[in-house]
A protein has these predicted regions:
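Nucleotide 5′-phosphate-binding alpha/beta core
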Residues: 1-109, 114-148, 202, 429-504
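Active-site phosphate/ATP/adenylate-binding loop shared across adenylate-forming ligases
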Residues: 2-23, 81-300
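Active-site rim elements
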Residues: 41-42, 302-306, 390-393
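Helix N-cap/beta->alpha junction signal
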Residues: 52, 211-212, 399
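Long, charged, glycine-rich C-terminal linkers/tails
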Residues: 72, 181-190, 416-424
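Structured loops at beta-to-helix junctions and adjacent beta-edge loops in soluble globular domains
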Residues: 154, 211, 237, 277-279, ...
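AMP-binding/adenylate-forming catalytic core of the ANL superfamily
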Residues: 208, 325, 330, 335-472, ...
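Conserved AMP-binding/adenylate-forming
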Residues: 247-363
Length: 504
């Protein structure tokens, strides 16, 4: 790609008005965005079929003639790619556009949370797309075009993708909005606290980016004076979180309504920034948390998934048999890539209709009362992967349900929200759920009754998982979790240098 194209794209970013862009997105019919995503899919396929050695070979082995793929319906007949049948079968170089490293502006790594780490070269144009997506979200939620802002990136962990992309994007946002600055203490509690103590007072607001367990730990340790005097906004990514978690964080930072204070970005190493929460999606999730009927109507089950909106210029997402399949532009393009994540798609019209049917009110009227202006970009929801959960007597227990149990007021003063769980068997082959919990800083293992904690955690877990609640009422103490306690920062389970692994 010519340098001129990068300069033009950057000029477009710096001269754009995200508030006007968001207003246009609220007026444009949703079909415009779906059509745009389909066009992205076809364009990305054509580039890959012509220039990516691995994908050419993949099509040949699957007896697929790329010349016959002309419409989106043709596109949907293409074989799915995956880590096993595509990424792991070819050298990294052969997976790249042109089969070479030309114009690959940065390379980062996955966290290895689902296996060995992989490396992801990307074009600078991908990052510019992230800049635009974050700009739209930051203006919608945080009014960064009107307030001086300090960006605190506490997600940096060396070569891993999320922290790297956020760090670069935050710096470009600070370049665009002049009365802003960016600092990157990384996933380091002391450095983050020192940064806030030294700098926060000079800005109208502070946006802190990080992983949910770190952010929860941070707000628990935040000095009351900083929490009281600072307008804190939170961006969480890297893993899903519940509305109970959002409400807990809101309470700790003094926010009554979290629609415009706490949001998440949904991303992955292979897909980059997939989507963002806007105020509308936060509101919908907050209502769904209190209405099982709405949750089931929207998502087909009573578990509340992540819900974001995605930009159609860089990706196309499909629901194939209840799993998300993604086509993504980039230095390492992916065509109909099976993410292995359970989830689905919704249009704004779908959501408004089901909201009216279940809640009995007009969604836009309710949003207007909260000062929220919706946009019409497509929604994607994500439950996560079954292999990221533990099983107990035939039911599935997700990390999100355990996280909710651990932030209960009854035990929160003893525990952080970090844990590791697994299904274990005793000598008689009885199945048990084992949860290794991290104690708060300064709390000693011998000062806490693990058995009492097990009882409280099981009661809280029953509140968030109806299946576990039924199991507990039937089997009583036989399904109480086995609780193992570790001191704060235990190197085996809770190293601050790595992304938390919830499944052992």
């Amino acid at each position: 790609m010519e340098t001129k194209e990068y300069i033009e794209a950057l000029n477009a970013f710096f001269s754009s008005n995200a508030r006007e862009t968001n207003a246009m997105a609220s007026k444009a019919p949703s079909k415009v965005f779906f059509d745009m995503a389909e066009q992205t899919a076809l364009e990305t396929f054509r580039v890959a079929a012509k220039t990516v050695p691995a994908y050419k070979d993949f099509l040949r082995k699957n007896k697929t003639d790329p010349e016959k793929i002309k419409t989106i319906e043709d596109f949907k007949t293409l074989p799915l790619t995956s880590k096993d049948n595509y990424l792991s079968k070819y050298p990294l170089r052969d997976l790249l556009v042109g089969g070479n490293w030309e114009d690959r502006f940065a390379t980062t790594s996955s966290s290895g949370s689902s296996g060995n780490p992989r490396y992801w070269p990307r074009f600078f144009m991908q990052d510019i797309g992230v800049f635009n997506g974050m700009d739209a979200t930051y203006v919608d939620l945080f009014d960064i075009d009107r307030k001086s802002t300090l960006f605190v990136n506490s997600a940096g962990m060396g070569v891993w993708t999320a922290g790297d992309m956020v760090d670069i994007a935050d710096k470009f946002m600070a370049m665009k909005y002049k009365n802003h600055s960016s600092i990157s203490p990384g996933i380091d509690m002391d450095n983050t606290l020192w940064s806030l103590n030294a700098l926060a007072a000079d800005f109208e607001q502070v946006i802190i980016c990080g992983y949910p367990p770190f952010l929860k730990d941070l707000v628990d340790q935040l000095p009351k004076e900083i929490a009281k005097k600072t307008d804190i906004k939170i961006i969480a990514f890297g893993e899903p979180f519940s509305e109970s978690w959002r409400n807990y964080i809101a309470k700790r930072i003094g926010v009554k309504k979290p629609y415009k204070s706490i949001c998440s970005f949904l991303g992955s190493s292979e897909g980059g920034l997939i989507g963002s929460e806007f105020a509308t999606s936060v509101y919908i999730r907050q209502v769904a948390q209190t209405s099982r009927k709405l949750t089931e109507s929207l998502f087909g089950q009573n578990q509340l998934p992540s819900l974001v909106q995605y930009g159609p210029k860089s990706k196309y997402i499909e629901d194939v048999g209840g799993q998300l399949v993604m086509t993504n532009k980039g230095g390492l393009p992916l065509i109909r890539y099976d993410t292995k994540d359970a989830g689905g798609l919704l249009s704004p019209e779908d959501i408004a209709s089901k909201y009216q049917e279940v809640i009995g009110r007009n969604l836009n009227d309710d949003l207007a009362k909260e000062g929220i202006v919706p946009n019409n970009m497509p929604y994607v929801y994500l439950f996560g992967r079954a292999d990221y959960s533990a099983t107990l007597y035939g039911i599935t227990i997700s990390p999100e349900q355990v996280k909710d149990a651990l932030i209960s007021d009854r035990i929160n003063k003893l525990l952080t929200s970090r844990f590791n769980m697994r299904t274990v068997y005793d000598k008689s082959e009885n199945q048990n759920l084992e949860i290794v919990c991290e104690l708060r800083r300064g709390v000693q293992v011998d000062s806490v009754d693990a058995q009492s904690l097990a009882g409280i955690i099981s009661e809280e877990l029953a509140h968030f998982s109806t299946e576990y609640g039924k199991l507990l009422s039937t089997m009583k103490g036989r399904v109480l979790p086995i609780i193992k306690l570790k001191e704060y920062g235990d190197k085996q389970y809770f190293s601050s240098k790595n992304k938390q692994k919830y499944l052992g």
